[in-house]
């Protein structure tokens, strides 16, 4: 098992090499919106998992997840060759591509926060005109005054 720090360094290097190759060297149009977000290398340095996101061509267009996955699978051999040449390790790790779900989870969290803000605003509007259900001081007994003169309520 390799040093965890070495595995992290190798993962970062692999991520940089693959991202650069996708952007500048591989000419598949399905990879135009693909971004490598993270990489993890196994403890024995034989397997590398690369996480990616896909952006649409425009803000209104949905990303092509299937096309990007197929293009990454097709380019896996070329990318592994580039990783081997760029890292200089004895055994070039096998590459596995996994779609990153963090942006989807972040979008879902933003929706939940927006819903909570809207509920808070509705509650603030309802509270604005509301009055107490009973007397302003519900603990005061009508007509009973404090006879000992203390303000703390202690009768010693």
Curated annotation (Swiss-Prot):
It holds the Pfam family RBFA. Residues 125-138 have a biased composition (Basic and acidic residues). Residues 145-156 have a biased composition (Acidic residues). Keywords: Cytoplasm, Ribosome biogenesis. GO terms for biological process: maturation of SSU-rRNA. The keyword Cytoplasm applies. InterPro entries: KH_dom-like_a/b, RbfA, RbfA_dom_sf, Ribosome-bd_factorA_CS. It is found in: Cytoplasm. PROSITE patterns: RBFA. One of its GO terms (molecular function) is ribosomal small subunit binding. Residues 125-156 are annotated as: Disordered. The keyword Cytoplasm applies. One of its GO terms (cellular component) is cytosol. It comes from the Bacteria. Belongs to the RbfA family. PANTHER family: RIBOSOME-BINDING FACTOR A, CHLOROPLASTIC-RELATED (PTHR33515:SF1). Monomer. Binds 30S ribosomal subunits, but not 50S ribosomal subunits or 70S ribosomes. One of several proteins that assist in the late maturation steps of the functional core of the 30S ribosomal subunit. Associates with free 30S ribosomal subunits (but not with 30S subunits that are part of 70S ribosomes or polysomes). Required for efficient processing of 16S rRNA. May interact with the 5'-terminal helix region of 16S rRNA. This is Ribosome-binding factor A. The lineage of its organism: Bacteria, Bacillati, Actinomycetota, Actinomycetes, Mycobacteriales. The gene is rbfA.
């Amino acid at each position: 098992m390799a040093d965890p720090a070495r595995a992290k360094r190798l993962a970062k290097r692999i991520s940089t090499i693959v991202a650069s190759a996708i952007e500048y060297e591989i000419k598949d149009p399905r990879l135009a919106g693909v971004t490598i977000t993270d990489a993890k290398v196994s403890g024995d340095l034989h397997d590398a998992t690369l996480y990616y996101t896909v952006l649409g061509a425009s803000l209104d267009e949905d990303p092509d997840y299937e096309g990007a996955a197929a293009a990454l699978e097709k380019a896996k051999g070329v990318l592994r060759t580039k990783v081997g040449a760029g890292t200089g390790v004895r055994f070039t790790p096998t590459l596995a591509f996994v779609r990153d779900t963090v942006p989807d989870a972040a979008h879902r969290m933003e929706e939940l926060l927006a819903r909570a803000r809207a509920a808070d605003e509705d509650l603030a509007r309802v509270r604005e005109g509301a009055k107490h259900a009973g007397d302003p001081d519900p603990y005061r007994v009508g007509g009973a005054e404090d006879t000992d003169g203390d303000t703390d309520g202690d009768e010693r």
